[in-house]
């Protein structure tokens, strides 16, 4: 059975893991590829401390982003309803449809905070009325907003 060595990845490698991961690889792979090309470094107590500090900083940053998303979710629910004006034909049907871009513009106008339209899920809206759109603010935080379509 071949001996394996433990290395710390300095960049993400699809077959092994992401940056900062500790992985066990064959000695030849580490010696001939990972270490010379700077894709990994030998594990030492100093390297372990460095990786631990980096992971702590990343966790703090991720927690901060999640808290900002939760605060924005609360702000959206406080506002309650966003109004979008569209042109309407004689039979009350919209010219075109309400898109996620329209919803993003309405939210940005009301909150002064930009939201990526690709994170907004809007049902097919072809008539006037009230609808609900879902917004993904963070991988763990979603929000629902009410949309009022008027002429």
UniProtKB/Swiss-Prot annotation:
GO terms for cellular component: ribonucleoprotein complex; ribosome. GO terms for molecular function: rRNA binding; structural constituent of ribosome. It comes from the Bacteria. Disulfide bonds: none annotated. Gene3D superfamilies: Ribosomal protein L9, C-terminal domain (3.10.430.100), Ribosomal protein L9, N-terminal domain (3.40.5.10). The keyword Lipid metabolism does not apply. GO terms for biological process: translation. Keywords: Ribonucleoprotein, Ribosomal protein, RNA-binding, rRNA-binding. It holds the Pfam family Ribosomal_L9_N. Belongs to the bacterial ribosomal protein bL9 family. HAMAP family: Ribosomal_bL9. Binds to the 23S rRNA. This is Large ribosomal subunit protein bL9. It comes from Prochlorococcus marinus (strain MIT 9301).
